[in-house]
Amino acid sequence: MFEVDLRSDTVTRPSRAMLNAMISSPVGDDVWGDDPTVLKLEAMFAERFGTEKALFCVSGTQANQIALMSHLSPGDEVICHPYAHIYNYEGGGIAANAHSSVVFTGDDRGIMHPEGVLSCIKADDVHYPKSRVLAIENTSNKGGGTCYEWEEIEALRAVASKHGLTFHLDGARLYNALVAKNQSESDYGTAFDSISICLSKGLGAPVGSVLLGSEEFIHHSRRIRKRIGGGWRQAGLLAGAAIYALENNVDRLAEDHAAAKDMAEFLGQQSWVKNVVAPETNILIFGLNEDMDQEAFISTLAEKGIGISQM
């Protein structure tokens, strides 16, 4: 265990106050639909984003995959960024679960642009997969925590609407973007057909993500969640932690962003650092000089109780 663990924002541990919130949360059976704390969490998110319904899921991967299985049919295609988590880090789920293909567009910071999306949309021809879903990630993990400007999202929404694409947001770190850009939850709820939001990253809950969308979409998604083994029983204990995170930890994300900027400034002054990607939120990417061995560097830090990860 590292004294200072900077490998990921997923390594958070519940505070004493969060643990107390978990212990005091009333529970029922979520599969039966009567866990009061889960119902409260789902209602909170639906109200904040202005969507009809929400669904509490075990992870961001599960929430994304449920959404994609709900939106796609075999032979369909997803337009996403080559850095996208749904493509790179979800076990080939688009192919294995939704029996669909992907096509890529976007810049080197993880951001997609309308002209690139337009170039990916297939003609209605039996030789081609059917362009069905436009999926973006905000913030972009591999892009270094980059955020979309709201005008960029509106432009992508316009493309999706014009060409009949379902617009999905992998919002694993959406609250980082909301804090960094001072954006509105309700605007996102209006712009997207489905949104996944992780609660166990910077927000600090131990487990869980939520999936947002229309009543019809969430009804279908709940069936898919059950099919893939995602129905859980006394999930209110975990929902209690998520509620605490939502009520207490959102504003504190700005502290993480400030810490990342301070670290970037420090690293930029070191002779052994080749380059530092200016952080927008809580992810900091930097490169070492060619004469530095990355694995040895990481091992040396680990010996000193500091954990970082290699991209």
Regions found by a protein language model. Give the residues of each.
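Active-site phosphate-binding strand-loop segment of PLP-dependent enzymes
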Residues: 6, 112-171
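General beta-strand structural signal in soluble alpha/beta enzymes
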Residues: 8, 33-34, 55-58, 80-81, ...
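Conserved N-terminal alpha-helix of the aminotransferase class I/II PLP-enzyme fold
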Residues: 14-60, 81-83, 87-88, 93
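Conserved core of the PLP fold type I
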Residues: 52-72, 105-106
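PLP-dependent aminotransferase-like
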Residues: 72-132
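Active-site C-terminal subdomain of aminotransferase-like
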Residues: 135-142, 184-185, 189-281
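Conserved C-terminal alpha-helix-loop-beta "cap" of PLP-dependent enzymes
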Residues: 261, 268-311
